[in-house]
Amino acid sequence: MKSGIRVALVTGSNKGIGLAIVRDLCRLFSGEVVLTARDVARGQAAVQQLQAEGLSPRFHQLDIDDLQSIRTLRDFLLKEYGGLDVLVNNAGIAFKVADPTPFHIQAEVTMKTNFFGTRDVCTELLPLIKPQGRVVNISSMMSLRALKSCSPELQQKFRSETITEEELVGLMNKFAEDTKKGVHQKEGWPSSAYGVTKIGVTVLSRIHARKLSEQRKGDKILLNACCPGWVRTDMAGPSATKSPEEGAETPVYLALLPLDAEGPHGQFVMEKRVEQW
């Protein structure tokens, strides 16, 4: 085991914002950086691309939709490093606006990865986070937009300081069920499946931060959700306003908060500023 060596890991990091975050961490983080991807060939190609730039990330396979894949990664981190110092949950999916896939299937598929996949990674890897560790969950300003389009009842639930992870899971499942029945609008949901999944990520971040403050008070771990902005990626398309490098700025800022920092913690951050949830 490489005891004493710090390690940072970014999910879904073979391209786009994830790759830009890995590049910055390779330059700025004092420790090893693990690039992950579902597809081994694509992940290794991304590592080679960074090696050509004089950087040296490690690669490990990770499909956040596959619990066994997450657990294999967990075991690797424990064996190699005895834990994890920085976790950036970047992996996620979105359907294009013009995609003909029925809405309820879009909702189910997007929810499975963006919320449940991210939650599974947190379940397995948060216990590995070392004192003064940093966790960054990539959410989206779409979560704030979707929240404001929810019914007052749903808004109240999602803004609650006491909502539990189980209650949040119940709400995310209800959204998927309501879309299947075609009653999601009647039930107070917005019409963006992606937005609802990112409400889930933001609220999950608030819950996990609260738990860390309660259960690991002295460990000074900081966990936040953030929006990278509208970034030119395969997901957002070519007309977006930011480059991937610009999109990486806020996530990297949160991943590298000084070790003596008191916050932000449990916040939703955009352009390095805390946004009101």
Curated annotation (Swiss-Prot):
Active site: 194
Location of this chain's protein in the cell: Cytoplasm
EC number: 1.1.1.184, 1.1.1.196, 1.1.1.197, 1.1.1.71
Annotated residues for binding of glutathione: 95-97, 106, 193-194
SUPFAM superfamilies for this protein: NAD(P)-binding Rossmann-fold domains (SSF51735)
Keyword Lipid metabolism included in the entry's annotation: yes
Residues given in the record as NADP(+) binding sites: 10-34, 63-64, 90, 194-198, 231-233
GO cellular component, one term: cytoplasm
Phosphoserine, modified sites: 30
The keyword Cytoplasm is assigned to this record: yes
Top-tier EC class: oxidoreductase
Entry protein name: Carbonyl reductase [NADPH] 1
Organism name: Macaca fascicularis (Crab-eating macaque)
